[in-house]
A protein has these predicted regions:
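Glycine-/acidic-rich phosphate or pyrophosphate-binding loops and their flanking alpha/beta elements
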Residues: 7
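Active-site beta->alpha loop and helix N-cap motifs at the rims of alpha/beta catalytic domains
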Residues: 2-4, 14-133, 143-147
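Catalytic alpha/beta core domains of metabolic enzymes, predominantly
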Residues: 112, 117-253
Length: 253
């Protein structure tokens, strides 16, 4: 499998890399939180731009990106507009979604953008091509906050992301029971063993699925989300605890 190198971080090798989300509403909140990150173990910062009050004014978005880049130094920055249909804070028209992501990629301040794979193939391709042209990597994503699809369906979605040339396919699903967590882990193992030629990210959400956020190095998920202040999805552990567990598992493997 090929790894993905972003600044000093190599995704897909060794310990799963920790992504910490920022979900502030105001510019002040966002930058203040970012300033606390030098004291905690973070590999990538995700700015959940759908939470930002000025998200539909690109000049304001770029202003925050510029300051984030300055505060974060060499920490890679992922910008994500999570749409309301996939659990995010706001709705957005597909063309506006494409424009936001491509313009952000072109600023030079972001290292990755997140693209929801079922936005429509034309829009998805436009964003992936636009980001790549700007030297920015793409996480293609899919979220099911209600259920866990069948193993074959999870693998199909991840393979679709890979086929559309996303750098890192990502899926997050909600377990209704413990067996659903096993389904997600089995899909992860099968995808990485049989199909993936690049890193993937998978997780089973909520408390029931928390084990999936810890065992990525065993089954093949290359990144995991930890909360510094406010979790952006159910089941996220605090980043310090997450880092400790990932390290203990890595050392024992």
């Amino acid at each position: 499998m090929n790894t993905v190198k972003i600044r000093d971080i190599e995704i897909g090798a060794g310990v799963p890399k920790i992504i910490v989300p920022i979900v502030g509403v105001t510019k002040e909140d966002i930058i203040e939180e970012a300033k606390t990150f030098d004291s905690i173990p973070i590999d990538v910062v995700e700015w959940r731009v759908d939470w930002f009050e000025g998200v539909f004014d690109f000049a304001k978005v770029e202003d925050v990106l510029k300051d984030l880049r300055e505060v974060l130094g060499n920490i890679p920055l992922l910008m994500t507009f999570r749409t309301s249909k996939e659990g995010g804070e706001k709705a957005i028209e597909p063309e506006a979604y494409a424009e936001l992501n491509i313009k952000a990629a072109q600023t030079g301040y972001v290292d990755l953008v997140d693209v929801e794979i079922f936005t429509g193939d034309d829009i998805v391709k436009k964003i992936i091509d636009g980001a790549h042209a700007a030297g920015v990597k793409v996480i293609a994503s899919n979220h099911d906050f209600f259920k866990t699809p069948a193993k074959a369906d999870i693998i199909y979605r991840l393979r679709k992301m890979q086929d559309m040339n996303a750098d890192i396919p990502k899926i997050a699903v909600m377990p209704q029971n413990k067996k659903d967590v096993l389904t997600l882990l089995a899909a992860t193992e099968e995808m990485t063993t049989n199909y993936a030629d690049r890193p993937i990210i998978t997780m089973s959400m909520a408390g029931t699925g928390v084990i999936s956020r810890l065992c990525g190095e065993v089954f093949g998920s290359s990144m995991t989300f930890g909360a510094a202040k406010k979790a952006s999805a159910p089941g996220q552990m605090g980043v310090n605890d997450l880092n400790t567990v990932l390290g203990l598992l890595h050392d024992a493997m």
